[in-house]
């Protein structure tokens, strides 16, 4: 009796399935445990998957478009800047609020409404640039069958973030969630963001200085911290070096100059209705500084922003005697809204000197299209450490394997 042969197509599918299972990579991300309900300012490193208006990028993450521009030191004085079209492949820092959810730090304030031809893999890998995996979206939304995704479904997009008490080596810091690209090395990432290999390894609980495409690192950016009273609604405001941030309902703009630790706030240029910004018992307005040279030194008087409470802008008059009078206030340079992405930013890896061990210090940074963090002084020690979690590096592979299993099962049924 002749033994039925297996269909050649079934054998082909089995081989592809085996190879897919063998070579599916595993991406790592840093998890920060938490037990309180406090929040912090954090950043997402996001690369545009297509040309998008500033307002469209803001809609993807449900954040203020002006805040995105200021976080990247882009000049907001240009006409109709919120509708400026940003080029595909542009890297942006997206400001978000990092919360404590189910015992770990993450942001769950982003929702995405599905469109025709969407699947969890394309949403994770393309729309959100690998900041989340298909499996994480599936779990967050209790999706039983990923292949049955109705158009118009609102999905929670759990995004990675870290707080680590807003410090790095006891200095103010904001943490950027950065998706590693194929061209990246840990040394190059450290150099780009003005930190050290040791610091990155400590923060991300890494045993070796090895990274793979799709890994998500928590990168500490040097920052300027506020000292607002706890009752202020913007208590804990912290701004990374080279960036700006809005406060008090678009009334106040705060900045952190490159290499600085001093937060400077002044009235914002936006046309909004604001409460008084004059300091009590003086004729100084928010952001004003007066100096008077004396034989004992320089008397400096400043009208500082002290947060907002119940809709009232809080100001504080500060007087100090300094050895010498300060120079003009320094600001991070503002960039014109970008229309193109330089080729070297799109394709060139971050500068990568030879690695001499975990204690190596990355040399002075070279800025990319948009400014990174400022310079962290000295060698880090005992930095914050998260834990490592793993997830499928390719959501597309996840659904491709599911598809192949279905085909294989169907072929078996036909051959039986």
Swiss-Prot record:
<keyword id="KW-0611">Plant defense</keyword>
<feature type="glycosylation site" description="N-linked (GlcNAc...) asparagine">
    <location>
        <position position="241"/>
    </location>
</feature>
<feature type="disulfide bond">
    <location>
        <begin position="34"/>
        <end position="100"/>
    </location>
</feature>
<keyword id="KW-1003">Cell membrane</keyword>
<feature type="signal peptide">
    <location>
        <begin position="1"/>
        <end position="27"/>
    </location>
</feature>
<feature type="domain" description="LysM 1">
    <location>
        <begin position="110"/>
        <end position="157"/>
    </location>
</feature>
<feature type="disulfide bond">
    <location>
        <begin position="251"/>
        <end position="279"/>
    </location>
</feature>
<feature type="domain" description="LysM 2">
    <location>
        <begin position="176"/>
        <end position="219"/>
    </location>
</feature>
<keyword id="KW-1015">Disulfide bond</keyword>
<dbReference type="GO" id="GO:0042834">
    <property type="term" value="F:peptidoglycan binding"/>
</dbReference>
<feature type="glycosylation site" description="N-linked (GlcNAc...) asparagine">
    <location>
        <position position="37"/>
    </location>
</feature>
<dbReference type="GO" id="GO:0005634">
    <property type="term" value="C:nucleus"/>
</dbReference>
<keyword id="KW-0325">Glycoprotein</keyword>
<keyword id="KW-0677">Repeat</keyword>
<keyword id="KW-0336">GPI-anchor</keyword>
<dbReference type="GO" id="GO:0006955">
    <property type="term" value="P:immune response"/>
</dbReference>
<dbReference type="GO" id="GO:0005576">
    <property type="term" value="C:extracellular region"/>
</dbReference>
<comment type="function">
    <text>Required as a cell surface receptor for peptidoglycan (PGN) elicitor signaling leading to innate immunity. Plays an essential role in detecting PGNs and restricting bacterial growth (of Pseudomonas syringae pv. tomato DC3000 for example).</text>
</comment>
<feature type="propeptide" description="Removed in mature form">
    <location>
        <begin position="392"/>
        <end position="416"/>
    </location>
</feature>
<comment type="subunit">
    <text>Interacts with peptidoglycans.</text>
</comment>
<dbReference type="GO" id="GO:0006952">
    <property type="term" value="P:defense response"/>
</dbReference>
<feature type="glycosylation site" description="N-linked (GlcNAc...) asparagine">
    <location>
        <position position="299"/>
    </location>
</feature>
<feature type="disulfide bond">
    <location>
        <begin position="224"/>
        <end position="256"/>
    </location>
</feature>
<feature type="lipid moiety-binding region" description="GPI-anchor amidated alanine">
    <location>
        <position position="391"/>
    </location>
</feature>
<keyword id="KW-0732">Signal</keyword>
<keyword id="KW-0964">Secreted</keyword>
<dbReference type="InterPro" id="IPR036779">
    <property type="entry name" value="LysM_dom_sf"/>
</dbReference>
<keyword id="KW-0449">Lipoprotein</keyword>
<feature type="glycosylation site" description="N-linked (GlcNAc...) asparagine">
    <location>
        <position position="310"/>
    </location>
</feature>
<feature type="region of interest" description="Disordered">
    <location>
        <begin position="356"/>
        <end position="376"/>
    </location>
</feature>
<dbReference type="InterPro" id="IPR018392">
    <property type="entry name" value="LysM_dom"/>
</dbReference>
<feature type="disulfide bond">
    <location>
        <begin position="98"/>
        <end position="161"/>
    </location>
</feature>
<feature type="glycosylation site" description="N-linked (GlcNAc...) asparagine">
    <location>
        <position position="288"/>
    </location>
</feature>
<dbReference type="Pfam" id="PF01476">
    <property type="entry name" value="LysM"/>
</dbReference>
<feature type="disulfide bond">
    <location>
        <begin position="100"/>
        <end position="163"/>
    </location>
</feature>
<keyword id="KW-0472">Membrane</keyword>
<protein>
    <recommendedName>
        <fullName>LysM domain-containing GPI-anchored protein 1</fullName>
    </recommendedName>
</protein>
<feature type="glycosylation site" description="N-linked (GlcNAc...) asparagine">
    <location>
        <position position="165"/>
    </location>
</feature>
<feature type="disulfide bond">
    <location>
        <begin position="40"/>
        <end position="163"/>
    </location>
</feature>
<dbReference type="GO" id="GO:0098552">
    <property type="term" value="C:side of membrane"/>
</dbReference>
<dbReference type="GO" id="GO:0005886">
    <property type="term" value="C:plasma membrane"/>
</dbReference>
């Amino acid at each position: 009796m002749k033994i039925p042969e297996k269909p050649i197509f079934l054998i082909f599918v089995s081989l592809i399935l085996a190879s897919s299972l063998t070579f599916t990579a595993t991406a790592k991300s840093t998890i920060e445990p938490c037990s309180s309900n406090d929040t912090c300012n954090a950043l997402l490193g996001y690369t545009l998957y297509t040309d998008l208006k500033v307002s469209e990028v803001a809609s993807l993450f449900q954040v203020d478009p002006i805040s995105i521009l200021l976080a990247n030191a882009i000049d907001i004085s240009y006409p109709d800047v919120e509708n400026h079209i940003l080029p595909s492949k542009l890297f942006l820092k997206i400001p978000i609020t990092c919360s404590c959810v189910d015992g770990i730090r993450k942001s769950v304030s982003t929702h995405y409404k599905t469109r025709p031809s969407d699947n969890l893999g394309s949403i994770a890998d393309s729309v959100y640039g690998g900041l989340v995996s298909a499996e994480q979206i599936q779990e967050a939304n209790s999706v039983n069958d990923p292949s049955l995704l109705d158009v118009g479904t609102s999905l929670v997009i759990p995004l990675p973030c870290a707080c680590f008490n807003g410090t790095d080596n006891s200095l103010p810091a904001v943490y950027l969630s950065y998706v590693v690209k194929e061209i990246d090395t840990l040394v190059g990432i450290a150099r780009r963001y003005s930190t050290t290999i040791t610091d990155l390894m400590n923060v991300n609980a890494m045993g070796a200085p090895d990274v793979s495409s799709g890994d998500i690192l928590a990168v500490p950016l040097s920052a300027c911290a506020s000292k607002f009273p706890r009752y202020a609604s913007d208590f804990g405001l912290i701004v990374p070096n080279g960036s700006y941030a809005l406060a008090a309902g678009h009334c106040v703009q705060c900045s952190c100059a490159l290499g600085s630790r001093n937060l400077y706030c002044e009235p914002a240029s936006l046309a909004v209705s604001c409460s008084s910004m004059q300091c009590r018992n003086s004729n100084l307005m928010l952001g004003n500084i007066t100096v008077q040279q004396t034989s004992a030194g320089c008397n400096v008087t400043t009208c500082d922003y002290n947060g907002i409470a119940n809709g009232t802008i809080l100001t504080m008059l500060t007087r100090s005697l300094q050895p010498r009078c300060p120079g003009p206030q320094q600001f991070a340079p503002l960039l014109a809204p970008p229309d193109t992405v330089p080729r070297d930013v799109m394709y060139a890896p971050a500068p990568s000197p030879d690695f001499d061990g975990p204690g190596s210090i990355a040399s002075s940074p070279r800025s990319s299209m948009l400014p990174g963090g400022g310079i962290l002084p000295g060698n880090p020690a005992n930095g914050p450490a998260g834990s490592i979690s793993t997830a499928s590096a390719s959501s597309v592979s996840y659904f491709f394997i599911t598809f192949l299993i279905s085909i294989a099962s169907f072929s078996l049924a036909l051959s039986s």
